[in-house]
């Protein structure tokens, strides 16, 4: 099993303290991996900085060819990656292989193409005897911090645009779910020049802090919690690094009386509970207009009750375990606090699964009020709340009354209403009559405490560049 890291083109073992990596479906330790030392963090950053001198000057074609090769080897090793992701994260194996691996491959292929389409502005004369041009150039060394919910996918989202733009990367996956990133290191070693990609292992305090605070790191990209984002922004403030933050969400799902209820039920059953709800865009905060509220709660409760939790390697499993024991306890605590309000009703679920592993039952809570913690705070588990609303104005205000601003959806047959509401929602993405749909060509990113910066799309590529003006006198 993967345990070696990648520093300056060499696969090495960490020199720091060993950390256990668990199988969340059983609670068993899969293996122990040694963290990198502070000296190894420094070596990785310096290797990336040295490699940037050449990699930053390569042609878009050359960078694209490397990204395409990496996409190909990920696709060829798709089963291996899916099995590692399933064992380390608890994801259903069929979901990892059929849903995530193709999307990951597509991200690398998209940015391979996008690398060849990134241009500055054409030259022009704005001062007599001088010609100006605008360049988009790479920044240098990017420190990327990936989360534990989609380890390989988030590694792809961070590596692909940074490399396509001509940057060099030092990636730290979550210490909870490092295995697919370490497998990626093994495959990337012979594709990219030494130092262009470096992949480390370790905790935030021991590895993340020295990495993000390193003086030669020019940009830090994080997908993680608000608390982690606040820490990194504060930690890097003195060195004025560029930061790119995706910090979670609490997606409002606005269901009007005229919505197709069957489509809503089918959608939320999938989009609210995919990956055991461990998704920052999960359809977890439903606002149902009072005319259809009771019907929606009844039908959705019946549908959610049919979701099957089970072993990740079982083809019939729809929900695996949560990622860690600590996270299981956080999710359980959030639901217990909701139940204690007295007015929130558990329609289905609401408890830990008995037996081994970190399983929580798919849960639907009805009667939640706007100010309830279950409505306002991200649970990041298989938990969906439903709140009744009266009219369009009220629900738009409630939807926007949140510290988060990542994703949202509107369900209605009224095209005018769909446009009106979508225009007023303070979220990076709004879906209409669907939810959770992501494509490489479109940007993903938030507002408010959900962060700033875009993943995927040409906008994501531009985030990893600096705009420069060059003026030539003649």
Swiss-Prot record:
Pathway annotation from the record: Amine and polyamine degradation; putrescine degradation; 4-aminobutanoate from 4-aminobutanal: step 1/1; Amino-acid degradation
MF terms in GO: aminobutyraldehyde dehydrogenase (NAD+) activity; NAD binding
Classification via InterPro entries: Ald_DH/histidinol_DH (IPR016161), Ald_DH_C (IPR016163), Ald_DH_CS_GLU (IPR029510), Ald_DH_N (IPR016162), Aldehyde_DH_dom (IPR015590), Aminobutyraldehyde_DH (IPR015657), PatD (IPR017749)
Keyword vocabulary terms for this entry: NAD, Oxidoreductase
Residues reported to bind NAD(+): 146-148, 172-175, 209, 225-228, 280
Assigned EC number: 1.2.1.19, 1.2.1.-
Keyword Methyltransferase: no
Catalytic activity: 4-aminobutanal + NAD(+) + H2O = 4-aminobutanoate + NADH + 2 H(+); 5-aminopentanal + NAD(+) + H2O = 5-aminopentanoate + NADH + 2 H(+)
Annotated GO biological process: L-lysine catabolic process; putrescine catabolic process
Catalytic site positions: 246, 280 (nucleophile)
Miscellaneous notes: 4-aminobutanal can spontaneously cyclize to 1-pyrroline, and 5-aminopentanal to 1-piperideine.
Family per record: Belongs to the aldehyde dehydrogenase family. Gamma-aminobutyraldehyde dehydrogenase subfamily.
Function: Catalyzes the oxidation 4-aminobutanal (gamma-aminobutyraldehyde) to 4-aminobutanoate (gamma-aminobutyrate or GABA). This is the second step in one of two pathways for putrescine degradation, where putrescine is converted into 4-aminobutanoate via 4-aminobutanal. Also functions as a 5-aminopentanal dehydrogenase in a a L-lysine degradation pathway to succinate that proceeds via cadaverine, glutarate and L-2-hydroxyglutarate.
Subunit structure: Homotetramer.
Protein name: Gamma-aminobutyraldehyde dehydrogenase
Protein species of origin: Shigella flexneri
């Amino acid at each position: 099993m993967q345990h070696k890291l990648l520093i300056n083109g060499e696969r090495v073992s960490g020199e720091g303290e060993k950390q256990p990596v668990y199988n969340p479906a059983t609670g068993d330790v899969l293996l122990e991996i040694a963290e990198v030392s502070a000296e190894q963090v420094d070596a990785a950053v310096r290797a990336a900085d040295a490699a940037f001198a050449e990699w930053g000057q390569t042609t878009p074609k050359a960078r694209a060819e490397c990204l395409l090769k990496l996409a190909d080897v990920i696709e060829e090793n798709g089963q291996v990656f899916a099995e590692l992701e399933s064992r380390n994260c608890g994801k259903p194996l069929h979901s990892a292989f059929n849903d995530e691996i193709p999307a990951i491959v597509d991200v690398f292929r998209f940015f391979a193409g996008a690398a060849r389409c990134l241009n500055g502005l054409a030259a022009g004369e704005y001062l007599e005897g001088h010609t100006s041009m605008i360049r988009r150039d790479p920044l240098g060394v990017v420190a990327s911090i990936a989360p534990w919910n989609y380890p390989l996918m988030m590694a792809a989202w961070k590596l692909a645009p940074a490399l396509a733009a001509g940057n060099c990367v030092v990636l730290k996956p979550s210490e909870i779910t490092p295995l697919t990133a370490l497998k990626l290191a093994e495959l990337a070693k012979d594709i990219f020049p030494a130092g262009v990609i470096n992949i480390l292992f370790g905790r935030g305090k021991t590895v993340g802090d020295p990495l993000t605070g390193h003086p030669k790191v020019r940009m830090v990209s994080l997908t993680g919690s608000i608390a982690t984002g606040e820490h990194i922004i504060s930690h890097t403030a003195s060195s004025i690094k560029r930061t790119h933050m995706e910090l979670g969400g609490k997606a409002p799902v606005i269901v009007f009386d005229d919505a197709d209820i069957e489509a809503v039920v089918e959608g939320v059953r999938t989009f609210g509970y995919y990956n055991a709800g461990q998704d920052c865009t999960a359809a977890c905060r439903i606002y149902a207009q009072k005319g259809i509220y009771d019907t929606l709660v009844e039908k959705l409760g019946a549908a959610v009750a049919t979701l099957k939790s089970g072993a990740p390697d079982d083809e019939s499993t729809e929900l695996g375990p949560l990622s860690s024991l600590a996270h299981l306890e956080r999710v359980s605590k959030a639901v217990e606090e909701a139940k204690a309000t007295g007015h929130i009703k558990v329609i289905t679920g609401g408890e830990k699964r008995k037996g081994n592993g970190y399983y929580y039952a798919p849960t639907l809570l009805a009667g939640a009020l706007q100010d309830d913690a279950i409505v306002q705070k991200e649970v990041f588990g298989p938990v969906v709340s439903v709140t009744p609303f009266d009219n369009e104005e009220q629900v738009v205000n409630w939807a926007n009354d949140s510290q988060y601003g990542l994703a949202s959806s509107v369900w209605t047959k009224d095209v005018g209403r769909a446009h009106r509401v979508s225009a007023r929602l303070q979220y990076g993405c709004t879906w209409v009559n669907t939810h959770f749909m992501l494509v490489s060509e479109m940007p993903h990113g938030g507002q408010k405490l959900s962060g700033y910066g875009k993943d995927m799309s040409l906008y994501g590529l531009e985030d990893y560049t600096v705009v420069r003006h060059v003026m030539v006198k003649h």
